[in-house]
């Protein structure tokens, strides 16, 4: 991926209310193999993170100046170093106001992937390790720990500039379990949530379950299509790309590539044509299957606790809201 501009600054700050001290770099980093490796590893770690949110910029204001500075840089009114200096000074101020914040190296990278321009911003920390020297001595060594990436954002510059209706050109890591630690970083970017990734993913899985039921698919076909959906969505999440409903529909049924897409539109699930997949929600979407003499059962894991209840003590499976076709067959049997 071509790196257009990249720079790192350091904010020295402990989470004890002490002042944040900025050590700013005066010039951009030169492009190198090490820099390309760092950005590739950062993207890989970022894409793998669960609990990300997607959104858009707040209206530019004194509280949210970042988008204005970014626009000025992209319009050629200031260079990348000056833009990053303005931004990191603003981050330093917000860190001082947040007693929970911890400093670190702040990376700004403007790069291109395919035909799309991105800006990545991440707060990086070191971990202590060891290394073996040329003299075969063991010595302490520090390394950037991208496995502990907790504060980062990625802005799809091309989407922001070319699609004024978009509500998902920014992604950022949210604090776990409602923690407020990351709020100051979200405010630094000036981002508001625009797309509910977990909610959209849950709706997709509900629409797919309804589709499988309405098509009365054999168990093997249902299992294969479920595997296709989860594989596609997980792959998109790993690459940091959104789910595209039309593309997914074509993969689910190559002979009728519009069938699933038309099912979604006709039933009015209210889903966006594109949205980010939530990996945590996807991990819950697996099929339980079982066979015995004269019996075959298959259902999605997310139905446990709602439509399906497992009573281990009595060795029973309780099914609520039976499929219409099954009920019709049972009624005809009684008649």
Swiss-Prot record:
Keywords: Cytoplasm. It comes from the Bacteria. It is found in: Cytoplasm, Nucleoid. Transmembrane segments: none annotated. GO terms for molecular function: double-stranded DNA binding; single-stranded RNA binding. One of its GO terms (cellular component) is cytoplasm. Belongs to the YejK family. HAMAP family: NdpA. NCBIfam families: PRK00378.1. This is Nucleoid-associated protein Pmen_3549.
